[in-house]
Amino acid sequence: MSRKTLYELQAENVRKTYLFIVTFSLILFAIGYFFVWYFNWGLTGIVLLAIFIVLYNWIAYEQSDKIALASVGAIPANPEEYYVLHNIVEEVALAAGIPKPNVYIMEESQPNAFATGKDPKHASVCVTTGLLQMMNREELQGVIAHEISHIRNRDILLMTVVAVVAGLIILLRDVMLRSMWWGMGESRRRDKNDNGAIILLIIGLIFSIIAPLIVLIIRSAISRQREYLADATGAYIVRDPYGLASALEKIGNYTRPMRVTSDATAHLFISNPFGRAEKLFATHPPIEERIKRLKSLTM
């Protein structure tokens, strides 16, 4: 099988993003239509549902990076205080042939990092304070190169949209559970032995069980191969696979989970923020395998 060019990979990521948005819109409409039917909202409910889906898709596409950054408490990195970090980001971005992304900091002891945005002109890189404290310049450069690779390969749009959508799925689960117990509205089936309420209870229970699985499946849709590709691309950008390999080794040895994160955003990070190895639906390859592949690269 022939290798894909960078432009083919970028185009594929954009297509997958649009396909994901369309698929999710259909699922969301099906769930929303049940609420419209159950609470007897009629045509008004359908119109409001359609407006909500369009608005949410716009937010997911245009504002997902801001949502992702805000959800983890990231703040802009002061150029004077974090001069070395800004310098490394600028150097790596120049070597990768993309504009310098915005630079953010997370007050977090776990060494980690992620990139977000919709394209290379509207992108951000965020690192934890723990990463800055633990890494030397070569290791930090390797981590930044990995994240810059996600930007250059246009992984970031799909990854960030998935994070926002996964967050909505979790929210829908909570709304479904609350509506089950609070019994909001009047069902058109209430006259018939509360059949509507029973149906909602059953659907709510099912959805509350499968919602976390949906989140895991969505996260795993972000192929593990993207991480391998970003590792390799980053190594070639800075002409050094050992900096990132050493950084991953230190990251892998840190097992304490991150204080502020969620299942919705876990796949964005360079390493699993929960500080544990996941086998089923894992979005990150084993760190040991990533290190092995990096050390086998020839520059």
UniProtKB/Swiss-Prot annotation:
GO terms for biological process: proteolysis. It is an enzyme of class 3 (hydrolase). Coiled coil: none annotated. Keywords: Cell membrane, Hydrolase, Membrane, Metal-binding, Metalloprotease, Protease, Transmembrane, Transmembrane helix, Zinc. Pfam families: Peptidase_M48. It is a multi-pass membrane protein. Zn(2+) binds at residues 146, 150, 227. Its EC number is 3.4.24.-. Its cofactor is Zn(2+). GO terms for cellular component: plasma membrane. The keyword Ribosomal protein does not apply. Belongs to the peptidase M48B family. PANTHER family: PROTEASE HTPX. This is Protease HtpX homolog.
